[in-house]
Structures are given as C-alpha cells and as structure tokens.
C-alpha cells in the first residue's frame, strides 16, 4: 500500500511537467476575398441549415431524399469511418491516464513424505504511467481528435453531395417526363401533317419535296423522343444507384415538372460560405492532424519518463486483513 501512496504522490508531483510541451501553434491563414457579395442580400440570414430541400414544398422529393440518405452505401461507409475515428480518439485519450493491471495467482504444493499440502493465493495490482514531458502523447491524442472531427465533416460532405445528386436526378426525371409528353404531342401533330401532305401530294396540290420534308420532320421528332426516353431511363438508373439498388420501381419519381415555390438562398460574405463547406473543414482539420503528427515524430526523439508501481499479497496476509480490517 505504501508503494501505491508513493506512486500517487509521484504522479501529482510530475503532472506539472507536461508544461514542457513542444506542440506547434496553428494559425488559420487569412483569405483575400471580397467583403460581401456583389448582389444584394435582401436581409436574409447568413446561415442556412437543416433540411433546406423542404423549401421546395414537394412531399415526393422529401421522401426520396430521406430514402437516399437512409439506404445509400456511401453514407453507410462514411458513418462506419466516423465510428472508427471516434473509437480511435477514445483509445488515444487513454494514453494520458495511468494503466492498471490486476492479476490473481494461485499455487499449491504437497509433501510426498508426510502427505502435507499447502496452497497460496496471491493477488497483485500494478500501475504504470508515462509522463507526457514533451507533449508527444498529447500530439497523438490531437491527431486522433482531428481525424474524428474530419471524419464527421466527411460524413456531412457525403450527405450534402448525395442530397445534391438526388435533387439533380429528380428534376432531370421531371424535365424529361415533361419533354417526352410534349414531344409525343408534337409527334402526333407531325404525323397528321404528313398524312395531309401525302393526300395533297397525291392530289397534285404540293410537290414531292413538301412530302419529303414532312416525313423528315416526323422522323426527326421520333429520333428526339427515342433519345429523351433513353436519357430518362439513364436518370432512373442513376437514382436507383443512389438508393442502393440496381432495379425496381421508383415510387416517388416525377412524371412532369411541377411549378412550385423556389426557396430563398441565404447569402453571407464569401469567406463565411467557403468556411461552412464540409470538405473545406475536413481539409483544414487534416492539416492540423498533419501538424500534430509532426509534433509526435519530433518529440519521439526526446527521452521519456515512465512511473510504475505495484502491490501484492499472499493468502495468509489476505486472511489477516479480512479478519482484522483495522490493522
């Protein structure tokens, strides 16, 4: 027990030595950007967060975005990377605290001459602690912390990218649906024009050139419709991939463009907008991680100080302690 007391006193006396840190100081560089947008902000707030796509007031779009965020494989991978980084940060934190190990040993002997036997039970407790003299352990902890924060921004960037792609494919499907509907109506008109032109040609009212031109216009519209139909199929496949599947129906896919409200865009100064991007935040955090890695490597050449202590007892001593705890 005296060893443990001395160890605790030593830990308190040497904890202040961590002030000898050799960590680098990070300074965010100043950006040469315009102080404000050239256009008027019209009094809108400089921060816009949350489910901003709901500003379009389209329930089908809202359901589709939520389905993509729940089922997309990239979101799951980014989530797993974040969990792994958080576990790494928790593990790095344990390097700054004492490590404790306990053992329980038992042994027995028997005298072959007189048949007497004896047994011993020996529990032991060991403590070890590395004093972070130069900030090496703190640098390792900072690395894990920066990586965890960067992984969180990676998840946010993946989420933002998927939302953008979902909206893009959604409106592409809507536009192509409207274009196909309009093209089908135009094709029907061109077919009627061709029939009328053919009748006039057979009656001698128009030349063969007029008939050929009418037929070419119909054929051109048919080719255009075929291209639009193929593009719509490709947009549907892209949306299925966002949903994490390669086939099946798209219940919330639009058939035509619907004119609805367009949400206002919150405007701020360019530097603020740039700093809010998750990919920019992740890059800055990983830069700080790199600086911490350099600190760890540099301080790794310095001497280290480790404190250890232990306590053990045998079965006889343990029995006495249990019988007389005041001793």
Regions found by a protein language model. Give the residues of each.
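Periplasmic alpha-helical coiled-coil/stalk elements that build and connect Gram-negative outer-membrane
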Residues: 137, 153-269
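Amphipathic alpha-helical coiled-coil scaffold segments and their short linker/junction regions
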Residues: 46, 69-71, 143, 206, ...
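Hydrophobic, lipid-facing positions within transmembrane beta-strands of outer-membrane proteins
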Residues: 121-127, 269
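Terminal intrinsically disordered/low-complexity segments used for targeting and assembly
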Residues: 2-70, 145, 229-275
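Extracytoplasmic/secreted envelope proteins and their assembly/folding machinery
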Residues: 53, 62-65, 79, 89, ...
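Small/polar (Gly/Ser/Thr/Ala-rich) solvent-exposed segments
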Residues: 96-118, 128-157, 176-179, 281, ...
